[in-house]
């Protein structure tokens, strides 16, 4: 820009209305702080690197790390020096502004010259102010030249201060293709893992829902039907036993279920054999004859079935003769306490009277036998 073409009013106004040198000095202080931090970082980085490689970490890996990190330390030192130079240049620009500011006339002085010139011209009726007007114009020309010179000097100093050494970025110390290779390796490693997880998930789902279990559970109906059939057969058996009095007439079912102490050999149809072979007597003639008679009786009844009521039964089902038994020894069984003897047959169904040969007072009974126990002292 040609500052000589601009009047002093413009140059003075630009110089006095700007931000001044304060911003340049603040920038210089910031560059000084940055230069100090970079220098400190470079020293600490170099110290740690030297201690690590010399004392704690040795070998090819340590040497490779030191060779790779050394350029970065150099870049820190170089950048710190350039930053310090920038701060110096900023101060130089601030100094150039201060000099130009001091050389530039204040705008009020220039304005006063113009006001004086106008007053002289207004009162110059007879030419008496011609010399004063010329002096005022000369003074204004000097102001013009002074402001132009100040601006030219400031432009030159500012241009010199703006000549800075460009900053350079740090050199790449890592492998640029390392991230790509790492991503590829991770992808290659995760693909089989994802396939394995999917396979395991499918296998677990197949285990939790087995295919051999039907969805309608109809097979349970057959199980329940079989159970019901078994229950019906048990009910029929109980009905027949209660109707014909098989327990009392045959003497083969539920023998001694009421009281074991009242069971006798006659209840099983072997009373005569037991009496014939009683201890101390040996086998007597009567016993032998009895046995023979028993055998002859069986042989004589071949081909003819015994009858109980209207029912034909085998000969071995004859009603046995019973007799009272003697009391058991203290070491034997004792009479179990119980309730009254229940009647035969099912409730509501008439039964057949007990055979006359059963002299024992023991009668068969059905249902649950209730037992009353005394209250023990330990229960409180």
UniProtKB/Swiss-Prot annotation:
Keywords assigned by UniProt? Answer: Acetylation, Cell outer membrane, Membrane, Transport, Virulence
**Annotated localization:** Cell outer membrane
Report the induction information: By glycerol supplementation as the sole carbon source in the minimal growth medium.
Q: What is the consequence of disrupting this locus?
A: Unable to grow on minimal medium with trehalose or glucose as the sole carbon sources or in limited medium containing trehalose. Resistant to trehalose analog 6-TreAz. Slow growth on minimal medium supplemented with maltose or lactose as the sole carbon and energy sources at both neutral pH and acidic pH 5.7. The supplementation of glycerol or glucose promotes growth at acidic pH, but reduces growth significantly at neutral pH in minimal medium and on solid agar.
Where, per the database record, does this protein carry N-acetylmethionine?
A: 1
Q: What is the effect of changing residue 204 to P?
A: Resistant to trehalose analog 6-azido trehalose, but not to 2-azido trehalose. Normal growth on trehalose as the sole carbon source
User: Per UniProt, what does mutating residue 147 to A do?
Assistant: Resistant to 3bMP1 compound. Defective in uptake of propionamide, glucose and glycerol, and is unable to grow on them as the sole carbon sources, but grows normally on hexanamide
Its GO CC terms are: cell outer membrane; peptidoglycan-based cell wall
Is Ribosomal protein included in the keywords of this UniProt record?
no
GO-annotated biological processes: cellular response to xenobiotic stimulus; D-glucose transmembrane transport; glycerol transmembrane transport; lactose transport; maltose transmembrane transport; modulation of process of another organism; response to host immune response; response to starvation
Instruction: Tell me if Transport is a UniProt keyword of this record.
Output: yes
The primary location reported for this protein is membrane
Q: Name one GO molecular function term.
A: lactose transmembrane transporter activity
Q: How does it assemble?
A: Interacts with PE19 and PE25.
What does the record give as the function of this protein?
Small molecule-selective channel required for the uptake of nutrients across the outer mycomembrane. Transports glycerol and glucose. Involved in sensitivity to M.tuberculosis growth inhibitory agrichemical 3,3-bis-di(methylsulfonyl)propionamide (3bMP1). Transports maltose and lactose disaccharides. Plays a role in response to starvation and stress, likely environment within the host. Inhibits canonical autophagy in infected mouse RAW264.7 macrophages. Inhibits autophagy and enhances intracellular bacterial survival when expressed in human macrophage-like THP-1 cells. Inhibits Toll-like receptor 2 (TLR2)-dependent signaling leading to autophagy inhibition, increased intracellular bacterial survival, reduced phagocytosis and reduced secretion of interleukin 6 (IL-6) and IL-1 in infected mouse primary bone marrow-derived macrophage (BMDM) cells.
State the family named in the UniProt similarity comment for this chain.
Belongs to the mycobacterial PPE family.
Record protein name field:
Transporter PPE51
């Amino acid at each position: 820009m040609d500052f000589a073409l601009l009047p002093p009013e413009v140059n003075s106004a630009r110089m006095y209305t700007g931000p001044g040198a304060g911003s340049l000095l603040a920038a210089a202080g910031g560059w000084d702080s940055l230069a100090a931090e970079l220098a400190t970082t470079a020293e600490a980085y170099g110290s740690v690197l030297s201690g690590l490689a010399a004392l704690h970490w040795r070998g090819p890996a340590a040497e490779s790390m030191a060779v790779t990190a050394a350029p970065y330390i150099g870049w820190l030192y170089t950048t710190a020096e350039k930053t310090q130079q920038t701060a110096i240049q900023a101060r130089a620009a601030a100094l150039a502004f201060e000099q130009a500011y001091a050389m530039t006339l204040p705008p009020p002085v220039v304005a006063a010259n113009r006001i004086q010139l106008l007053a002289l011209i207004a009162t110059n009726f007879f030419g008496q102010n011609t010399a004063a007007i010329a002096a005022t114009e000369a003074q204004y020309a000097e102001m013009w030249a002074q402001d132009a010179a100040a601006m030219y000097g400031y432009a030159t100093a500012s241009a010199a201060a703006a000549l800075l050494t460009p900053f350079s970025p740090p050199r790449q110390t890592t492998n640029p293709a390392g991230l790509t290779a790492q991503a590829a390796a991770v992808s290659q490693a995760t693909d089989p893992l994802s396939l394995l997880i999917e396979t395991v998930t499918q296998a677990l789902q197949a285990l939790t829902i087995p295919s051999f279990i039907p969805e309608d559970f109809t097979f349970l109906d057959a199980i329940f039907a079989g159970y019901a059939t078994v229950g019906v057969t048990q009910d029929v058996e109980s009905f027949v036993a209660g109707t014909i009095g098989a327990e009392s007439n045959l003497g083969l079912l539920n023998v001694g279920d009421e009281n074991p102490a009242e069971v006798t050999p006659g209840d099983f149809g072997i009373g005569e054999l037991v009496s014939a072979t009683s201890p101390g007597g040996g086998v007597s003639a009567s016993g032998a004859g009895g046995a023979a008679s028993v055998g002859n009786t069986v042989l004589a009844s071949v081909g003819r079935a015994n009858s109980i009521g209207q029912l034909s039964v085998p000969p071995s089902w004859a009603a046995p003769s019973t007799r009272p038994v003697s009391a058991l020894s203290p070491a034997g069984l004792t009479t179990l306490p119980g309730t009254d003897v229940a009647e035969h047959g099912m409730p509501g169904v008439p039964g057949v009277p007990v055979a006359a040969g059963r002299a024992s007072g023991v009668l068969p009974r059905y249902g649950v036998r209730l037992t009353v126990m005394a209250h023990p002292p330990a229960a409180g």
